[in-house]
Amino acid sequence: MRILFDNINFNSRSGPNSFGKKLRDGLLKLDHDVRDSFATGENPDVSLSFIINQKPTMPNVLRLDGIYFNTSQDFNALNDPIRRSYIAADTVVFQSKFNQHLTERYFGSVENTYIIGNGVD
């Protein structure tokens, strides 16, 4: 399977990027073609987006590890691109049950949701 990892930096050690790198390494061991970009004409089978979907032209799995809810910030504006990605996703993977409940409270429920914690080792 050809998998596009969207909105990720494999060289970063931050939370979502670190998780993405471990997941990529595991998928590569299973002989999947995993990249953060594909050349024109090379069509991935699915996109795995981290927090925000930047490539909405193919089937998409969105991995969410949180949303903004701090009332001292304009959390509605900060959440808007996340909310749009959440609603458009074919499947959503949450980092935790807390994250799922918080997201559903602010954005509503969608179909095809799963919880996969960070322990991917």
Language-model region placement:
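Carbohydrate-associated surface elements
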Residues: 98, 116-119
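Short hydrophobic segments within beta-strands
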Residues: 4-6, 63, 116
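Short beta-strand scaffold positions
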Residues: 49, 94-95, 115
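Active-site proximal beta-strand in glycosyltransferases
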Residues: 46-73
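N-terminal pre-catalytic "stem/leader" segment of glycosyltransferase-like enzymes
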Residues: 1-44
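Short, well-ordered alpha-helix to beta-strand connector turns
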Residues: 31, 42-46, 58, 88-90, ...
